[in-house]
Amino acid sequence: MTTLADLRINYSRASLDEADAAPDPFAQFDRWFNEALAAKLPEPNTMTLATVGADGRPSARIVLVKGVDERGFVFFTNYESRKGRDLAAHPYAALLFYWIELERQVRIEGRVEKTSAEESDRYFASRPVGSRIGAWASEQSTVIDSRATLEAREKAFSERYGDDPPRPPHWGGYRVVPDTLEFWQGRPSRLHDRLVYTRDAAAPHGWTISRLSP
């Protein structure tokens, strides 16, 4: 039987060099994300979101990034969920994109702010009706007694709002505004390439690029 200690692969698909890296991290992310799309990876917009609660306990979960530009990385959720409560207490987060098929990771850290109501409304209106009803039906992260309770709430809100449910006041977007972004490319013998962009107003393009030891 294979033991956990024996599970390993040697990464050799690509390299990451300072000379080839984009001058700003958003352009570099766009480049890698488009390569993930071209490789037809399943849901390349999935990312791990890590937060810390008022009690100092960390928490992580998978969410979907729904917008990326020079301002940051946007996701949407229930503001009253555990992640929402964490961010209310400590408005900082870490993100991780992991594209194992390309032997790549992108790590992002920064402060978090809510998106505007207009931006949240616009995205909410683009969602399927069932997902919009679900945002009303689910009191996210609270204990319920059964699946039947959730389905009853879904039915009640569907009857109430029909095909045009409005955005709940407790549901909307967050933007992670990065101060550091690390691009990790797997390499042979665990001597991986790691380039980190650090926000620096005095630097060209507003970012410095450094190589980290693997």
Curated annotation (Swiss-Prot):
InterPro entries, per database record: Pyridox_Oxase (IPR000659), Pyridox_Oxase_CS (IPR019740), Pyridox_Oxase_N (IPR011576), Pyridoxamine_oxidase_dimer_C (IPR019576), Split_barrel_FMN-bd (IPR012349)
* EC number(s) stated in the UniProt entry for this protein: 1.4.3.5
Can you tell me which residues bind FMN? Answer: 61-66, 76-77, 82-83, 105, 140-141, 184, 194
How many cofactors are bound and how? Binds 1 FMN per subunit.
The answer to whether UniProt assigns keyword Oxidoreductase to this entry is yes
One GO MF annotation is: pyridoxamine phosphate oxidase activity
Keywords attached to this Swiss-Prot or TrEMBL record, sorted alphabetically, are: Flavoprotein, FMN, Oxidoreductase, Pyridoxine biosynthesis
Which pathway does this polypeptide act in? Answer: Cofactor metabolism; pyridoxal 5'-phosphate salvage; pyridoxal 5'-phosphate from pyridoxamine 5'-phosphate: step 1/1; Cofactor metabolism; pyridoxal 5'-phosphate salvage; pyridoxal 5'-phosphate from pyridoxine 5'-phosphate: step 1/1
Relate the assembly described in the record.
Homodimer.
- State what protein this is by name: Pyridoxine/pyridoxamine 5'-phosphate oxidase
